[in-house]
Regions:
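Glycine-rich phosphate/dinucleotide-binding loop and adjoining beta-alpha-beta core of small-molecule
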Residues: 1-161
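Small-residue (G/A/S/T)-rich helix-start motifs and N-terminal tracts that mark the onset
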Residues: 1-18, 124, 135-222
Length: 222
C-alpha cells in the first residue's frame, strides 16, 4: 500500500500541478493507494508516525528547487518525523530533485543548521535535468545522500546555454592527463620541486593544506 500525503491546497496550485493532482486522485483506489491530507489532530500525527515506521521507503517530494529560508508548519514537523524514522533505521528516504529544506543554489539549509530540526536527510536524491549546486555545497551536501542525475529528456548543451551563471563540477577524468602516474623507477627529483611561502608559526593551517595538496598532486619535493 502507498500512502500519499498531499500537503498543499488545490486552490494554490498552478494549472499544471492541478492536472497532476486530478490524475493522482483518479489513480487512488483506497486499497493500494490512499490519499491523505496534512496531519491536524494528535491522532493524525500518531498515525503518521506509525505509517512511517511501517514503511520501507519514504519519497520526499514536498519542496523542490525554489526553497529558501526556513521550513514552515506543518512541513517542519513532518520533516522531523521522517528524519526520526530514518534515524531509527526504519525507512530509506529518497528525495525528488532536492531534499526538502535545502536551497538548490547555495546549499543553505532550513534554520541554518543540519543538526537542528531543519532539513530532511535523504539516503538518495534523484535530481532532474542537471546537478544542482546545493547538492554539492555544504551543508546541503550532507542532506543529499547518494546523488543520481536523471536528464528526463533535457539536452545538457541547451541547459548550459540557458544558464546565466553556469558552474562545472571537476571530475577525475578532467585531471587524468595532468596528474600522470609515476614510473616505477622515478625518484623525488623526477617530478619537480615546489617551494611554499605562506602562513606563520601561529597559523600553520594554510601551509599544511598547500603542502598536502602539492604532494597529492604529484610533486616530487615540497
Amino acid at each position: 500500500r502507498v500512502y500519499v500525503y498531499v500537503l498543499g491546497k488545490e486552490e494554490d496550485y498552478s494549472d499544471e500541478a492541478r492536472q497532476h493532482l486530478h490524475t493522482l486522485q483518479q489513480l487512488a483506489d483506497e486499497e493500494t493507494c490512499l490519499l491523505l491530507s496534512a496531519p491536524q489532530s494528535d491522532a493524525d500525527w500518531q498515525l503518521l508516525q506509525k505509517r512511517l515506521l511501517a514503511s520501507s521507503v519514504v519519497i520526499d517530494a514536498m519542496l523542490g528547487t525554489g526553497f529558501h529560508g526556513s521550513l514552515r508548519q506543518p512541513l517542519a514537523s513532518i520533516v522531523a518525523e521522517v528524519n526520526a524514522a530514518a534515524a531509527a533505521g526504519a525507512v530509506t528516504v529518497i528525495a525528488v530533485d532536492m531534499p526538502t529544506g535545502v536551497n538548490s543554489d547555495t546549499g543553505a539549509v532550513s534554520n541554518g543548521d543540519v543538526d537542528e530540526d531543519g532539513p530532511l536527510f535523504a539516503d538518495m536524491t534523484v535530481t532532474f535535468g542537471a546537478l544542482k549546486r546545493g547538492l554539492v555545497l555544504y551543508p546541503g551536501r550532507a542532506c543529499a545522500g547518494h546523488i543520481e542525475v536523471d536528464p528526463i529528456g533535457m539536452p545538457g548543451p541547451l541547459l548550459m546555454q540557458l544558464e546565466e551563471d553556469p558552474a562545472y563540477l571537476l571530475q577525475e577524468s578532467d585531471i587524468a592527463e595532468i596528474v600522470v602516474p609515476r614510473s616505477p623507477d622515478s625518484h623525488k627529483g623526477t617530478h619537480g620541486t615546489i617551494a611554499i611561502v605562506t602562513g606563520s608559526s601561529q597559523m600553520a593551517g594554510a601551509a599544511l593544506m598547500a603542502a598536502h595538496g602539492a604532494v597529492r598532486s604529484g610533486a616530487g619535493k615540497v
